[in-house]
Structures are given as C-alpha cells and as structure tokens.
Amino acid sequence: MTVLQEPVQAAIWQALNHYAYRDAVFLAERLYAEVHSEEALFLLATCYYRSGKAYKAYRLLKGHSCTTPQCKYLLAKCCVDLSKLAEGEQILSGGVFNKQKSHDDLVTEFGDSACFTLSLLGHVYCKTDRLAKGSECYQKSLSLNPFLWSPFESLCEIGEKPDPDQTFKLTSLQNFSSCLPNTCTALVSNHSLSHRQPETVLTETPQDTIELNRLNLESSNSKYSLNTDSSVSYIDSAVISPDNVPLGTGPSILSKQVQNKPKTGRSLLGGPTALSPLTPSFGILPLETPSPGDGSYLQNYTNTPSVIDVPSTGAPTKKSVARMGHTGAKSVFSQSGNSREATPVLVAQTQSSGPQTSTTPQVLSPTITSPPNALPRRSSRLFTSDSSTTKENSKKLKMKFPPKIPNRKTKSKTNKGGITQPNINDSLEITKLDSSIISEGKISTITPQIQAFNLQKAAAGLMSLLREMGKGYLALCSYNCKEAINILSHLPSHHYSTGWVLCQIGRAYFELSEYMQAERIFSEVRRIESFRVEGMEIYSTTLWHLQKDVALSVLSKDLTDMDKNSPEAWCAAGNCFSLQREHDIAIKFFQRAIQVDPNYAYAYTLLGHEFVLTEELDKALACFRNAIRVNPRHYNAWYGLGMIYYKQEKFSLAEMHFQKALDINPQSSVLLCHIGVVQHALKKSEKALDTLNKAIVIDPKNPLCKFHRASVLFANEKYKSALQELEELKQIVPKESLVYFLIGKVYKKLGQTHLALMNFSWAMDLDPKGANNQIKEAIDKRYLPDDEEPITQEEQIMGTDESQESSMTDADDTQLHAAESDEF
C-alpha cells in the first residue's frame, strides 16, 4: 500500500501546529518508513526536536547523510543543544578537515535560512572564545535579516557596540522580502499574471521611511494587471507548512470546510488591513479566495485611501461606490508612529448585473468578535455578503471624507514614542501619492507594488521600535544605566508596560544601587507577567539587599513551584536562605542552580560570595573563576576575586582584579571605592584620594565612598577634613555606629576628649554588639596610626565586619552590593 506524501505531510504539520507531538511523531515515522527521502527524514527529525527529544533528532540525522540545508541546520542545532560545539561547527562551516566556508558560501548554500545559520555559528564561535569571528557572524546575520533580535543582544553582551541605526534598517524591497515567509510573497505573486515581484527598489530615508519611486505606470499595464485565478485556493498556513505544500497548487482536500465560512484575514506585516482598536496596523492576508460566484472579497489599506478590487469570475459589474470605515488605534508598527487617531479606510461596495440577493453596502464591521469557526485572532474580520460582486476595473472612486492628518496632540505623542517627525511627513507623502494613483484609475496596474509597499511601511515602524530598544539595551550592556532608563522609559506605553522592557529598567536601577526603585519596577513585572522567570534572580537579590524576607520567600516559593528547571528559581531560593543566615542551605540551592544550567554565570558568583561568608576562600576562588570562564564580562566575578585577594592581603592582585571589573563597568562608584581602598593599602594615599573623589563625583551620596575617604583623610592626619566628611556622612546615615566611632577617634586626636567620649557612647548605644552595621567594610586597623584606644569592641568590628547582617533601611550599603559586595 502506497501512502500519498502530501496529505500525510499536511496532517503532520497540522499536528505540530496544534502541539500534538505524539501524533506528529507517529505519522512522521509512518511516512519515513514509506518514503525514505530527505524531506521525510527532515520532517521526522523536526517532530523529534519539537517534542523536546533533541538527542533523537541528532542520532537520526547523524545516521543518515544529510545533504539538504534544512537537515544540516537542524543537525547543527541539535549539536549545539547537546554541547557538541565542534561537531556543530564542522557541519555548518566545514571545520578543520574540510575547507572553511566563507559567509558568502553559507548564504549561497542555506539561502533564506542563512541568517539563522550564521547566528547559530556565531553562538558556537562565542562559546569557544572566538569572539571576533562570532561578532562577524552575528553582524552578517543581522544584515541578512534585521528582524532578528538575539544576534544583536549577543553582540551587546560580548562587549561589541553595534549601531542600532545601522543594524535595524531595510535597504531594499528585495532584501526585505527575503526576511519574510513564503506566504507573504505569495500574496503578491499569486495576484499577478506574470507571477513576478515588481522590480522596484525602494529608497531609504534615515528612519526607513520609504518613498515610492516614479513608476512607469503605462508601460506596466500589461505586466501587473490584477487577475485572480479562480482555481487558486489559499490553504490555512496553520495546517500545511509553506515549505512543503505551496499555497497556489489548486483546491486542497484540507480546506473543504471553508466554503461557508465568512471571509477571514490573517494579520501579518503590511498588506491590506482591517483592524480592531486593540491590534497593531498589520495587514490582513486572505486565507482563501472567493468562490467563482462570490465577489464580496474586499481589501483595504491603512494610511492609504485606496480600494484594492480583486476581480471575480462572476457576472460583469456596473459601478462601484466607495464608503468610509474607520480603523481603531494604530500601533508603533504603523509608519506614522504611535498616532492614536483613527484613519479612514475605503470599503468598496459593488453592484452586479447578474443575479444578486442584496444591494446593501458592505461596510467594515467594528466588532472584534470572531465567528466560532474563524481563526482565534484578535484582529477584526471583514464580514461581507456572499452575493455581492467586486468590480474588476474600477475607474471612478468617490471619497466621502478626506483622510485625517495627525493633529498637534498626535505629533507630540509620536515624538515621545521615539518616532521622529519626518516619518509622519513622509507617510503623508506616501498617502497623497497613493491617492493620486487611485484618482487616475490605475489601481489594478500597481496593486503588487502597493502590497509590497505596505509591507515595507509596516516593517519600517517595527524597525524604528527595534532601534530604540536596541539603543536602550546597548546602553545597559555598557552600564550607562541612566541613559538606558531614559531611552526605555520613552518607549510607547504598550511596549513599556511589558515584562522584558521593565526587567531591563529594573536591572538598570539595580546596577545604580537604587534598590527601592528596582523593587518597584520588578514588582510591576510580577503583576503584569507573573509567569516571567527571566530577570527574577536580580529581583531576588534586590529583595535581599532590602532585607524583605517575606517578599523574597514568596518569590522563591512561586518560582520553584513554577519552574524547577530554571536557574533563576534556585538562585532566588538560595538568596532567601542566605538572608536567613542559613548559609549551608543557600549553598546547596546555588549548586542546584548550577546543576540545572552549568553556563549560568550569576549562580557561580552567588555561590562564591556564599563561600566567602563561610570562610571557604579556595572554593570561592574556584566559583568566581568558573563564572569568568562562562562569561568573561561578568564584572561581579572579577570583583569577587579582588575581594578575596584583599582579604588575603594580596593588594596588588586585588587592585588588578578590581581594575578589570572597572574596565567592564566604568560607571561603578563602588568599584572605584574599592580600588581607592586597595591603593591606600599599597601606601598610595594621594592616588587613593583621587580615586575616591572620582567615585563620589559619580555618586555624591554614596556613603561607603565618603566613609572610606574620611578614613583615608584620618590616616593621613587630615583631621579637620575627615571631621567635615564624617559630619556630611552622618546626615546620610544618621544611625551608623561606625560613623560616630570614627568621629570619636577624630575628636580624640584633636584633643577634645569630652566630644570623643560622647561619640563613642553614641556608637555603643547604636550598636552594642557590633553586629548591625549598615556599612559592611569597617575601618581597618591599617588605616589608623598606632594608638591605644579604650574602646575595644569597635576595634573588633573593624576586621570582622563583612557579614550579611546589615539593615538596609537607608541607601548606604546598597552601594556596596551594586558591585556585588561580599555577597553578590
């Protein structure tokens, strides 16, 4: 018995798209047993991989000669997932034994999937410490497909500084069309007799606003007339993969049920649009064409007051009347930016000389409620009468209202959202040009151009959004945290109020040691996306600094219940027990985080700080070195190594590691502060004061920096300057015992014994056991000249005060933790 391949393939893709992986695997195994082809092999391996069985896909593909680009890419993907990096590299680029393939060779071999191939190869290079080659692969991947975000993200994380303005742009229609799925280009090609893309190169403005070139409309009448073959049937892409079953292959056995279904549209970048107030200005792609007797299929465009009439094979038409409908709110993906103004859309109503049951004008339904058998999309549908027909060549279109122009209020909103004013003007020029084309009665001539043109317009809005987000993320990876907060805070509200953006802002506040603000942002993330795990390790550390044990306990419980395979959840649990001073349990949880993800650098760092607290310095050194091995730009681990060497009084090594951390994060006042302390220990007191002054310039209210500067001044016998510094510090941290203790020592040196005793008494009252300091690094004996002090309790505090028992009610020791002080 022979199994027909195409129906089985369609059934497999339908099962995959409905997450019925067991059914998909079973059918794919039957198909591969019947047809031993590369296509069936790839389909079976895809089923294995999507069902989470990468090792099965790897062994299947490894046991057969993979010659097609699809199979090669999937095999390489499996190798990377299984940590077989060398094998994955050899599959993609040739490796050591074969000739190394260039980027152009990869583009030629893999075609449209070359951008993903290069991104995967770049990941392999970066994991094997070949950052320069990895950077080249990422950049080439982005040049092929600017819609990819992860290559840009990876470039920022390895220390590169890609220019978002040059990265997220579209240079031509040809380049743009290569980034889209086959179904998108099929929309244009299937509507033309020649089945060709228009050879139109779209010029680029600084913000990717495209102006339509002067087209020779008369000469193109014969090339781009719009006719639709009635035998063409669009098949739901959720049922059949476009790579295996072309959309224009005739009526499908899988789409019989669509005969009585209202005409629906699928939202995609650009194209004709019929939008609800809740959806972005993406277009509606037809999922099926009208039947020969049904000419009610309508198309309309946002920002383009035109009617795109699809000819019907039914009775001849007489006349066409244009009606106005309104779309709802436009999103950032529309070319005119974040305008909330409604834009008029033309909806054509036609009358036929043939039999018809109704002459009621068909208008765009404002509701967003889909019929029961429609696809579950939020975008609104076109509901039209089954009996009306569409005119084939409309010569006269009447506009009842002119299109609205964004008013002053809209412009101000647009500018705030990061979409510049020239975009609006260029968009209006496009609209005017489209209007003039319609008035000349040549709409059927340039329909393919307009369709591609609207795809480009919608994509330009997405590019503008990605540019702004890219600038914010680049600033954050460069530790320009204030700039990152400013850029991300000016994103459109509906993008700002998402988990990813808020997590980046929360992380920026965390790096600035503004823990109260960070906690506020992260709590908002938890409110709007309670399922988000990414970034919650930073939230847990924030709560640790703020000593909010209840909130931290709730967070860790929720995360571990939700996903026991995420390292973030176990880091939160470890922080929870660390706050309770249960260091042994915390160590076990941090080790569990590493077990779950051995490439998670932050877990190594937290574990290292925990070992420091238990005085297991050798284990702590190993943890910090592992963190650096996983991520050389993880400055927290460099800081941890510096702290250990400082404890061991290896001051030169400590300074070197602190300096390495500062090279990664030059905006950290805490790192500068520690470098100043080490320099003073190396008898470089003047240089230490300069370094501490730089730290205070960056953060004038950093109590740790001011405290250390006062200590250095005191050690250099500049008592009056030290006293002035301590009086200012007392205003910032009025309940810090060590401040009063050092003030007492200054007064004693000045010979004012009564004031010295008074401050010593206050220090004892504030901290009778020396266990509740807010500034963890106390005065070290090496700071002070040799003298006999009657207060011995505070002397004990000096060398031992590096525990986690601090009360974080003021913004003091938070500064220390911003650079991962003694813990993180």
From Swiss-Prot:
Location of region: Disordered: 251-273, 285-325, 346-423, 781-824
PTM characteristics: Phosphorylated. Phosphorylation on Ser-427 and Thr-447 occurs specifically during mitosis.
Phosphoserine: residues bearing it: 291, 339, 380, 387, 427, 436, 439, 821
First and last residues of every TPR repeat: 84-114, 115-148, 499-532, 567-600, 602-634, 635-668, 670-702, 704-736, 737-770
Pfam families xrefs: ANAPC3, TPR_1, TPR_8
Superkingdom, natural source: Eukaryota
Keyword Coiled coil belongs to the record: no
Gene Ontology molecular functions: protein phosphatase binding
This protein's GO CC annotations: anaphase-promoting complex; centrosome; cytoplasm; mitotic spindle; nucleus; spindle
InterPro entries in the record: TPR-like_helical_dom_sf (IPR011990), TPR_rpt (IPR019734)
Keyword Ligase set for record: no
Low complexity composition bias: residue spans: 349-362
Compartments in which it is found: Nucleus; Cytoplasm, Cytoskeleton, Spindle
Phosphothreonine PTM positions: 205, 209, 313, 367, 431, 447
Primary site of residence: nucleus
Keywords, alphabetical: Cytoplasm, Cytoskeleton, Nucleus, Phosphoprotein, Repeat, TPR repeat, Ubl conjugation pathway
A Gene Ontology biological process term: cell division
Compositional bias ranges of the Basic residues kind: 396-414
This protein's pathway: Protein modification; protein ubiquitination
Subunit structure: Homodimer. The mammalian APC/C is composed at least of 14 distinct subunits ANAPC1, ANAPC2, CDC27/APC3, ANAPC4, ANAPC5, CDC16/APC6, ANAPC7, CDC23/APC8, ANAPC10, ANAPC11, CDC26/APC12, ANAPC13, ANAPC15 and ANAPC16 that assemble into a complex of at least 19 chains with a combined molecular mass of around 1.2 MDa; APC/C interacts with FZR1 and FBXO5. Interacts with RB. Interacts with FAM168B/MANI. Interacts with MCPH1.
Function: Component of the anaphase promoting complex/cyclosome (APC/C), a cell cycle-regulated E3 ubiquitin ligase that controls progression through mitosis and the G1 phase of the cell cycle. The APC/C complex acts by mediating ubiquitination and subsequent degradation of target proteins: it mainly mediates the formation of 'Lys-11'-linked polyubiquitin chains and, to a lower extent, the formation of 'Lys-48'- and 'Lys-63'-linked polyubiquitin chains. The APC/C complex catalyzes assembly of branched 'Lys-11'-/'Lys-48'-linked branched ubiquitin chains on target proteins.
Family from the record: Belongs to the APC3/CDC27 family.
Annotated protein name in UniProt: Cell division cycle protein 27 homolog
Species whose genome carries this gene: Rattus norvegicus
Gene that produces this protein: Cdc27
